[in-house]
């Protein structure tokens, strides 16, 4: 690691002036990006005039925009990798030029790029074969292992001794005000400081990589456990929930146990640091004795001062520890207890960073001590050849004294940092033990727990608490300020969310229970997100270790909410079918009552009870009777005065009575009977079956198309892999990777289409179940109205035996047909799942080979970047002790109608799309 840090002394400044001006690869990427930007802008500029359009923009267009962001990130990453490759090649060429012609190259600058890790420092440059063989080329200097010398010292070592001596007597520089000797010392000092920082950076990076790997391992374990829980709940139809008190206790216990484990590891590391520091102290003492043997004189004031400072630090530590114990002896509420745990977690994270810095400092001390001992050894070897009172010997002893002083100062820093680390570890350990003991004694503070009710009340309560608490504790004040800002921001967000929910409720007009559940979940998530954004961003990645149990509880709650939403949607669907049946029955009953009503309404207007006034004799009168079949009859025109005699009028009156009686009998005959009602229901089911078969055949036909596309893409991918094995090289790999990216995008599109197909198939399954329930209801109705007597004539409310048997046969045939359709649909689902699994496997393989991140990893990476908006983190306090949302005034309930459940919210279909249909057949298939 030290060698890799020291190898960064070479410069890439020369390579920064060279750029690729013409590149087909770059042109292709820019053109592709321009097209994607235009398409994305077109999506963004679309207007959502209605709720349906806004829902479509959110659930259809939003994934496309997310996909564009992912593709843009991958393109940027490819450009960065290409630039890194070119920079490495140019750096190698510049290194070769500097080695061949050192007198023509100025001193290089300090290199910050630590990615150039040459595993073999003795390996010659790549392009030395281009130099003529007769050229006198000096050898490349090796990277020093025990000491680090700057590039300027390496160049000066090639010069003649006379030139070096003449340079020592040069005049002071005007710009810096230093002589050449002082400048060389300053350069050497700065290079050593750079080496220390680079070493510390390497240790921090290695620790970060280990923590990052462990974080994703824990993430995968949590996902596997959640999948296991969901599968068991779906299999047995049960749902287990943990009580709030038990959940808080578990989360607090897990957080404290994680802190204790980390503190124990840090204590072991600190003990090892102490042992290493003792070894280095012995080596420094040995070097001091050897230097005293050369000089016969040494002072120890620094060590005494260090001891006095150490005693002062111990006394201050005891006072801090006592004050800490006094603070913890007070009664803690829920919020105070959560804040104490947060402070402990932040302190443990900072201690981990301090331990890494201490490791790098100890490494630097070891290297400096080795350099000092080598220098003393060289002086002792040359002591016999030099005169004791010569100027050269005095200068070398003076240099040894300076180096020894630097090493002692560095050792003093190591000692101070080690003592400070030990002090903070002891304090953190005692705090963790005290919090563990007070875990069961924490009082439930309901007033503070409901911090989402009223921001003004919370501010007043905070003022009272500030007056009662100790004013010197800045941590409590900071926590209260954060809480006030969080409450204000949360109230604003909740008001905006309430307005959005009211608009959604007005547009949908139903599903109030589902909306309230979704509103509560979204408000809670928003509060957690706001609290996490207000926390400091230092050490957040390491904090995920402690908050992993919180994340699992949040994920469990999220799954439970999804399950409840699916149950509500299923109930609404069942209610829709029941309402449809009731609506059909009511429609038939209303038609019968309508006929009776019109028949009774026309009776007083019969000619026997009185004709209208003779003034209306010139106008033709007509009587219309409304019916669902649109049947009507017309009255003939009345006779004019003086045209007919009294006898003829009486005859026409009698004829009209007979005609009206015939019409009333025909209307009576058109009243639907029970048999006609059952026949109409069966015909309606048959029409629905025809429409369902059309959709089902189209859906099943798509599976074969997906299968053919996947096989073709796999064949093309195998060709590309064989071509890649035949042509080995970086340029060929880049070209083949560009050829494989369209296949990767096509596979991702197929995966998305398969997921949509599975969701649509789940809807078809629900329709089959509803149709089966309809058939069962029709069968029960037929059984109920079947005539038990063997009479030849039955009433309109009964069905003859042979007609009932005929109906039962038709219903049985439709049930068998329904079962066959279900089996075909189940086979299609199994085939689609297998095809989706195969596509997932191929996509994962491509992502590993091409270095492409999927959407989840890209979002995680973007959230981990400092420039991102911040990862939505979960506050420990919220899930330890819970929160209460602001109570809003209830909106006046709208009048519920039978059409309120006809169009469920599209958000439910989107949120419940993760539900996988059961592999077993439903009960109605078994019974049929």
Swiss-Prot record:
Which key words are in the record?
Answer: Coiled coil
Query: Ranges of Low complexity compositional bias?
Result: 622-634
InterPro entries attached here?
Answer: NAB (IPR011684), NET2A-D/KIP1-like_C (IPR056889), NET2A-D/KIP1-like_dom (IPR056888)
Pfam families per the record?
Answer: KIP1, NET2A, NET2A_C
What would be one Gene Ontology cellular-component term for the protein?
membrane
Region described as Disordered: 108-144, 447-472, 489-529, 620-651
* Cysteine disulfide partners in this protein: none
Give start and end of each NAB domain.
10-90
Report which superkingdom the organism of origin falls in: Eukaryota
Instruction: List each coiled-coil range.
Output: 207-309, 360-445, 547-574
Task: Quote the PROSITE patterns the UniProt record gives.
Answer: NAB
Do the record's keywords include Coiled coil? yes
- Regions of biased composition (Acidic residues) lie at 110-119, 457-468
Gene Ontology terms for molecular function = actin binding
Q: Where is the composition biased (Basic and acidic residues)?
A: 489-506, 642-651
Function statement:
Plant-specific actin binding protein. May be part of a membrane-cytoskeletal adapter complex.
**Entry's family note:** Belongs to the NET family.
Q: What is this protein called?
A: Protein NETWORKED 2B
Report the gene name.
NET2B
């Amino acid at each position: 690691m030290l060698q890799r840090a020291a190898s960064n002394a070479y410069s890439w400044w020369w390579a920064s002036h060279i750029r690729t001006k013409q590149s087909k690869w770059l042109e292709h990427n820019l053109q592709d990006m321009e097209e994607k930007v235009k398409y994305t802008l077109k999506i963004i500029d679309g207007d959502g005039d209605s709720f349906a359009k806004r829902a479509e923009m959110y659930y259809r267009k939003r994934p496309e925009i997310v996909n564009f962001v992912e593709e843009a990130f991958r393109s940027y990453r490819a450009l960065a990798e290409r630039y890194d490759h070119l920079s490495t090649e140019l750096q190698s060429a510049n290194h070769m030029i500097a080695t061949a012609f050192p007198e023509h190259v100025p001193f290089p600058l300090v290199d910050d790029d630590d990615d150039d890790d040459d595993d073999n420092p003795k390996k010659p440059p790549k392009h030395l074969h281009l130099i003529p063989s007769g050229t006198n080329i000096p050898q490349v200097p090796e990277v020093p292992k025990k000491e680090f010398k700057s590039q300027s010292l390496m160049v000066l070592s090639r010069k003649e001794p006379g030139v070096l001596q003449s340079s020592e007597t040069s005049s002071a520089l005007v710009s810096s005000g230093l002589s050449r000797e002082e400048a060389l010392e300053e350069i050497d000092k700065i290079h050593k400081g750079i080496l220390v920082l680079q070493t510390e950076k390497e240790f921090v990076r290695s620790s970060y990589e280990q923590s990052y790997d462990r974080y994703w391992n824990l993430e995968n374990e949590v996902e596997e456990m959640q999948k296991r829980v969901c599968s068991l709940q779906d299999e047995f139809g049960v749902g287990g929930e943990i009580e709030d008190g038990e959940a808080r206790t578990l989360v607090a216990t897990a957080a404290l146990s994680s802190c204790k484990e980390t503190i124990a590891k840090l204590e072991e590391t600190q003990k090892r640091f102490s042992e290493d520091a003792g070894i280095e102290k012995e080596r420094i003492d040995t070097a001091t004795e050897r230097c005293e043997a050369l000089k016969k004189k040494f002072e120890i004031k620094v060590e005494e001062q260090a001891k006095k400072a150490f005693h002062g630090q111990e006394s201050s530590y005891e006072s801090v520890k006592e004050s800490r114990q006094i603070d913890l002896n007070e009664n803690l509420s829920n919020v105070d207890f959560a804040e104490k745990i947060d402070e402990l977690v932040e302190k443990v994270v900072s201690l981990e960073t301090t331990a890494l810095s201490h490791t790098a400092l100890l490494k630097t001390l070891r290297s400096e001590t080795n350099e000092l001992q080598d220098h003393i050894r060289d002086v002792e070897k040359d002591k016999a050849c030099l005169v004791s009172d010569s100027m050269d010997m005095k200068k070398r002893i003076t240099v040894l004294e300076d180096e020894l002083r630097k090493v002692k100062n560095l050792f003093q820093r190591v000692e101070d940092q080690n003592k400070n680390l030990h002090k903070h570890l002891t304090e953190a350990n005692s705090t963790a033990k005290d919090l563990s003991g007070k875990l069961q004694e924490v009082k439930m503070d309901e007033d503070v727990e409901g911090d989402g009710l009223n921001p003004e009340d919370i501010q007043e309560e905070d003022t009272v608490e500030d007056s009662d608490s100790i004013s010197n504790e800045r941590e409590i004040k900071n926590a209260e300020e954060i809480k006030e800002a969080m409450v204000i921001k949360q109230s604003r967000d909740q008001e905006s969310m309430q307005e959005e929910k009211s608009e959604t409720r007005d547009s949908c007009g139903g599903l109030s229970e589902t909306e309230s559940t979704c509103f509560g979940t979204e408000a809670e998530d928003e509060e957690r997100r706001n609290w996490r954004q207000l926390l400091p961003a230092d050490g957040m990645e390491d904090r995920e270790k402690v908050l992993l149990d919180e994340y699992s509880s949040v994920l469990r709650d999220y799954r439970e909410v999804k399950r409840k939403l699916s149950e509500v949607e299923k109930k609404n669907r069942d209610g829709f079918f029941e309402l449809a049946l009731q609506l059909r029955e009511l429609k038939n009953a209303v038609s019968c009552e309508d006929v009776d009503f019109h028949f009774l309404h026309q009776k007083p207007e019969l000619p026997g009870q009185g004709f209208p006034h003779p003034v209306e004799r010139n106008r033709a009168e007509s009587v219309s009777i409304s019916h669902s079949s649109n049947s009507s009859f017309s009255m003939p025109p009345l006779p004019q005065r003086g045209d007919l005699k009294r006898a003829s009028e009486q005859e026409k009156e009698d004829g009209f009575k007979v005609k009206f009686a015939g019409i009333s009998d025909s209307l009576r005959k058109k009243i639907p009977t029970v048999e006609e009602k059952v026949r109409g229901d069966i015909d309606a089911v048959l029409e629905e079956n025809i429409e369902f078969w059309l959709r089902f055949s189209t859906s099943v036909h798509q599976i074969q198309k997906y299968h053919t596309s996947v096989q073709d893409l796999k064949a093309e991918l195998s060709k590309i892999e064989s071509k890649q094995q035949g042509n080995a090289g970086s340029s060929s790999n880049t070209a083949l990777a560009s050829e494989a990216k369209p296949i990767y995008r096509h596979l991702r599109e197929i995966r998305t289409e398969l997921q949509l197909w599975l969701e649509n198939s789940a809807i078809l399954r629900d329709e089959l179940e509803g149709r089966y329930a309809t058939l069962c209801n029709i069968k029960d109705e037929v059984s109920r109205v079947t005539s038990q007597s063997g009479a030849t004539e039955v009433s309109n409310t009964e069905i003859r035996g042979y007609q009932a048997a005929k109906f039962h046969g038709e219903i049985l045939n439709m049930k068998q047909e329904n079962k066959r359709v279900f089996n075909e649909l189940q086979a299609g689902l199994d085939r689609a799942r297998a095809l989706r699994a195969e596509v997932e496997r191929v996509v994962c393989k491509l992502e590993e080979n091409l270095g492409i991140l999927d959407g989840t990893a890209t979002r995680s990476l973007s959230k981990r970047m400092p420039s991102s908006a911040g990862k939505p983190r979960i506050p420990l306090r919220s899930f330890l002790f819970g929160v209460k949302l602001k109570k809003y005034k209830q909106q006046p309930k709208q009048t519920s109608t039978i059409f309120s459940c006809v169009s469920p919210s599209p958000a439910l279909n989107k949120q419940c799309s993760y539900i996988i249909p059961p592999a077993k057949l439903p009960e109605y298939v078994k019974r049929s």
